[in-house]
């Protein structure tokens, strides 16, 4: 298999060669069956929107799109400010995304770009040493992410040939104030991936086939550092990966219309020399697979089943072991489900089971900043029921209930429920579609009591109390305008669902939030 850095170096040339292999004139692919261009006139459309909410929150967004003769262009920008309920805190977010696509008779090609910037500022917590200062210091955090991708797709008979090149850059800087002084941390990462694909549609003895084979060649690097009194350090890591994937979907047709999907993925991850195990090689192997099947037993009744194994590799971002990567996470899941009904009334039920090994989580209880770590083996078994019924022409009622038993498995703490995982979630929502562009919905969500974290040994007798919240929304359309009034936690119910300690480190979420917005379409 081709080395990853070399493959990524020639990726741009590959895209250019694929693009040059297509006709340069887009009008051939932009014509309909009668030879008339599909869009002889350019169509420019978009929308502008603004929202105001309690807590000093306000946001604006604008979007534009243009379509003509097989060419599509789109761009959007948004900005959000939020003061939250904490005095002196400020959150500022700006975003942009755009893209272009050209469709031809022989294929299509295009690109996308997006950028997100976030700035957070809030006063440092009260402490005795702060009284000696003329002004309280502030905790500052900045996060930026940039993504870009380009793709080319070519149609050759019943085959689709495609290649995509993607890049993502992340940047994070933080300044924290403490009793021993301030601490600074920084993070820079760059991720590149080249993904060639071959897809084929066909028939085999009356069975429809959809086959896809592909490669993912990935290169990732990260630089991080910390600066504090007497504790300075920097770290740099690189990681290359190559993956082979295969997907096959079979459609048998007939009365019950059986469908079967098979997916396989094998990935090799090349570790940084500093992360190699003492008695191992520099490559780590991971495998994933997916099997799904469905039957249409009756016009209104369908059943399905699926089983899968997946994995997740730590990005070596922020661990307590000196920036050393964690053990890869493994997930095994099975699910059975059935759906019955039509547009008037419907119901579905699914039974699921999930087993996790070396689950990668962010533990807020480790130090002031928290660290990423692996959990012991665990499992989650449950059932979910959803139903929908049209009460009248303009009224609809939806409801769902989810029951989950989450516990540690094959572990010294085998038996206790996993902290901060609710056993029962239930919700009911009523929808109304009125005349002259008016609509509304009202919902109630209920969460059953859950255990505090990090109570691994079941020593905390208290539980996070159960709570119910109410939210609603009213929308009115007036020509090109759309006005909306929405609210969450309308009953102003005091509740919280994030408590990393036993009756401590509680993050309240008990404020009624009202929002009003206006959107103009053109």
Predicted regions and their residues:
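Gram-negative outer-membrane beta-barrel transporters
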Residues: 260, 353, 374-455, 491, ...
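Transmembrane beta-barrel wall of Gram-negative outer-membrane proteins
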Residues: 54-81, 86-120, 138-160, 200-205, ...
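Repeated loop/turn-to-beta-strand initiation elements of outer-membrane beta-barrel proteins
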Residues: 70-74, 106-111, 157-161, 204-211, ...
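Membrane-embedded beta-barrel scaffold of Gram-negative outer-membrane proteins
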Residues: 160-176, 219-222, 260, 296, ...
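Structural signature of Gram-negative outer-membrane beta-barrels, strongest in the C-terminal barrel
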Residues: 204-212, 216-218, 232-356, 390, ...
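Transmembrane beta-strands of outer-membrane beta-barrel pores
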Residues: 50-54, 68-70, 79-83, 92, ...
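C-terminal beta-signal and adjacent terminal beta-strands/loops
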Residues: 2, 26-27, 31, 449-453, ...
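Flexible loop and strand-edge segments within Gram-negative outer membrane beta-barrel domains
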Residues: 82-83, 87-89, 108-155, 161, ...
């Amino acid at each position: 298999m081709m080395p990853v850095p070399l493959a990524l170096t020639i990726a741009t040339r590959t895209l250019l060669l694929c693009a040059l292999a297509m006709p340069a004139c887009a009008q051939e692919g932009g014509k309909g069956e009668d030879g008339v261009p599909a869009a002889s006139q350019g169509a420019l459309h978009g929308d502008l929107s603004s929202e105001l909410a309690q807590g000093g929150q306000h946001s604006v967004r604008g979007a534009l799109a243009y379509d003509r003769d097989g060419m599509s262009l789109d761009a959007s920008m948004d900005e959000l400010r939020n003061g939250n309920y904490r005095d002196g805190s400020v959150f500022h977010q700006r975003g942009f995304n755009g893209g272009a696509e050209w469709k031809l008779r022989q294929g299509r090609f295009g690109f996308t770009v997006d950028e997100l910037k976030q700035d957070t500022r809030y006063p440092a917590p009260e402490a005795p040493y702060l009284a000696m200062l003329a002004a309280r210091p502030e905790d500052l955090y900045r996060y930026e992410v940039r993504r870009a991708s380009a793709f080319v797709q070519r149609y050759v008979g019943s085959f689709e040939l495609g290649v995509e090149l993607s890049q993502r850059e992340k940047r994070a800087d933080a300044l924290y104030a403490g009793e021993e002084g301030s601490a600074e941390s920084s993070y820079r990462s760059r991720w590149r991936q080249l993904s060639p694909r071959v897809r084929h549609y066909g028939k085999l003895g009356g069975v429809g086939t959809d086959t896809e084979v592909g490669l993912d060649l990935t290169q990732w690097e990260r630089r991080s550092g910390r600066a504090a009194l007497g504790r300075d350090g920097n770290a740099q890591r690189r990681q290359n990966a190559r993956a082979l994937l295969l997907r096959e979907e079979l459609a048998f047709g007939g009365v019950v219309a059986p469908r079967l999907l098979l997916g396989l993925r094998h990935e090799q991850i090349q570790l940084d020399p500093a992360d190699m195990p003492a008695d191992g090689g520099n490559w780590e192997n991971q495998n994933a697979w997916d099997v799904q099947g469905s039957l249409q037993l009756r016009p209104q009744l369908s059943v399905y089943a699926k089983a899968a194994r997946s994995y997740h590799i730590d990005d070596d971002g922020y661990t307590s072991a000196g920036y050393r990567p964690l053990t890869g996470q493994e997930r095994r899941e099975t699910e059975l489900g059935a759906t019955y009904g039509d547009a008037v009334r419907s119901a579905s039920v699914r039974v699921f089971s999930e087993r996790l090994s070396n689950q990668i989580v962010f533990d807020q209880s480790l130090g002031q900043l928290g660290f990423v770590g692996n959990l012991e083996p665990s499992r989650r078994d449950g059932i979910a029921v959803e139903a929908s019924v049209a009460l009248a022409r303009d009224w609809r009622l939806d409801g769902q209930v989810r029951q989950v038993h989450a516990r540690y498995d094959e572990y010294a703490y085998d038996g206790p429920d996993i902290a901060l995982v609710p056993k029962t979630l239930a919700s009911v929502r009523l929808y109304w579609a009125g005349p002259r562009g008016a609509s509304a919905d009202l919902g109630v969500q209920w969460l059953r009591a859950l255990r505090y974290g990090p109570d691994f040994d079941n020593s905390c007798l208290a539980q996070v109390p159960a709570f119910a919240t109410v939210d609603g929304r009213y929308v009115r359309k007036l020509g090109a305008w759309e006005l909306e009034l929405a609210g969450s936690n309308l009953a102003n119910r005091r509740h919280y669902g994030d408590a990393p300690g036993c009756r401590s480190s509680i993050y309240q979420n008990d404020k009624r939030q009202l929002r009003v917005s206006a959107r103009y379409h053109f």
